[in-house]
């Protein structure tokens, strides 16, 4: 057998550039000294690296000063955060494994594990894990906007989507809690005028960016940020007129839409409990004299002393909109429906069975897995959490039942509890 350490450096460099995940790059660099040095520049220029983008937040606090009526505003800085989902198996038993989620510090050989269905950090572990004992494969990457200091997910975003541009600046698209699409450009969040829909999710398909709204209508988003209706909507006779959360997912080689079903009556009662007259809109206000600052030291004394009335607003280049209508406690999930586009019938049809597949719905990603590849994973099911909750639940498409992790003695949640931690 030849000496692999003597392969030409140019060839090793080309191999390193074609590695598909950070884990593969770590494995490559650990082979020997020559392989490690050949990949020394890959981390900086590799397509897997996460762009470091700092944002002004979408949500700010506005206040009117007591002394002169001046409108003051306050915000905390935010940054784009990348996380990755992995399948981990024992090298000695690779048939089944676990699902884990880690932030980008993984490239520094540290597992900073996150809750799989949210982005909250799990308890720190000092246990060292040797990659020689495990097989780690990347499933999906995801993005969120988090606080620079707190690293907590910014609550004003429903979705954060990164469009990588070869040789150019990457594009960041978001869906705010108001259901509107915005993009980051010129040091500010930019709104798109004349949006007629409330949006729910993004997907990149064959190089094009699409969004789905709460009625199940797909829209194409051009490189100039024009939003153009694309295709048919989900018919009300199969959705029962639901305008809840819709998510894109690739499953069995096709693009599906997952519709989260909620208690519409409960949602209406919560909406009716709000006084519409209390909703304050500052859109197109004049902020020539506004004092915008970042509280880098956590000192709120000046702000609290000077202000007598304040409000949380979503701020972009078009103005401000009050957050209050979007801060209601969400109702519980009562089920899901799954749809795919029938190209012959030219309409969305309901999918009754996922076969061996299971769908994982996280706050920052939605993807499918082969159930037989994960410990305890139920086929034809959907794993999820309710909003503002951490507990994992599973919905079974065959009987419509929902099982909660804390209330179950079943092994169907074993995939989220690695034995090596």
UniProtKB/Swiss-Prot annotation:
- Listed InterPro entries: F-box-like_dom_sf, F-box_dom, KIB1-4_b-propeller, SCF_F-box_domain
Induction record: By heat stress.
Example of a GO biological process term: response to heat
Domain F-box spans what residues?
Answer: 2-50
Q: Which UniProt keywords apply?
A: Stress response
Q: Which domain of life is it from?
A: Eukaryota
Role played: Involved in heat stress response. Contributes to recovery from heat stress.
Q: Which PANTHER family does its entry note?
A: F-BOX PROTEIN, F-BOX PROTEIN SKIP23
Q: What is this protein called?
A: F-box protein At2g17690
What would be the name of the gene that encodes this protein?
SDC
């Amino acid at each position: 057998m030849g000496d692999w350490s003597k392969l030409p450096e140019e060839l090793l460099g080309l191999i390193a550039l074609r590695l598909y995940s950070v884990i593969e790059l770590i494995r490559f660099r650990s082979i020997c000294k020559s392989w490690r040095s050949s990949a020394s520049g890959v981390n900086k220029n590799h397509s897997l690296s996460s762009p470091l983008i700092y944002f002004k937040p979408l949500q700010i606090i506005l206040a009117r000063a007591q002394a002169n009526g001046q409108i003051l505003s306050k915000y905390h800085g935010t940054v784009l955060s990348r996380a990755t989902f992995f399948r981990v198996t024992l090298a000695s038993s690779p048939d089944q494994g676990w699902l884990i989620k880690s932030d980008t510090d993984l490239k520094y050989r540290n597992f900073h594990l996150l809750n799989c269905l949210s982005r909250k950090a799990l308890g720190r572990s000092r246990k060292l894990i040797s990659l020689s004992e495990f097989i780690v494969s990347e499933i999906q990457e995801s993005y969120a906007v988090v606080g620079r200091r707190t690293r907590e997910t910014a609550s004003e975003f429903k979705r954060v989507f990164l469009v990588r541009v070869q040789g150019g600046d990457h594009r960041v698209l978001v869906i705010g809690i108001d259901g509107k699409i915005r993009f980051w450009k010129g040091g500010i969040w930019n709104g798109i005028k004349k949006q007629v829909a409330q949006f729910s999710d993004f997907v990149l398909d064959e190089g094009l960016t699409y969004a789905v709204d709460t009625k199940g209508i797909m829209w194409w988003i051009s490189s100039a940020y024009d939003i153009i209706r694309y295709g048919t909507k989900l018919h009300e006779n199969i959705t029962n007129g639901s305008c809840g959360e819709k998510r894109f997912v690739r499953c069995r080689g096709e693009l599906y839409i997952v519709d989260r079903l909620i208690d519409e009556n409960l949602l209406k009662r919560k909406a009716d409990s709000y006084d519409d007259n209390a909703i304050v809109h500052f859109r197109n206000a004049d902020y020539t004299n506004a004092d915008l600052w970042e509280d880098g030291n956590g000192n709120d004394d000046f702000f609290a002393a000077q202000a007598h009335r304040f409000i949380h607003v979503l701020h972009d280049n078009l103005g401000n909109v009050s957050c209050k209508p979007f801060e209601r406690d969400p109702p519980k999930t009562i089920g899901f429906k799954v749809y795919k586009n029938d190209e012959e019938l030219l309409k969305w049809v309901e999918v009754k069975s996922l076969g061996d597949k299971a769908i994982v719905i996280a706050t920052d990603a939605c993807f499918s897995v082969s159930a037989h590849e994960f410990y305890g994973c139920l086929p034809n099911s959907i794993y999820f959490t309710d909003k503002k909750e951490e507990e994992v639940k599973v919905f079974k498409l065959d009987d419509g039942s929902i099982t909660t992790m804390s209330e179950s003695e079943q092994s169907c949640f074993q995939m989220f509890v690695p034995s090596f931690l």
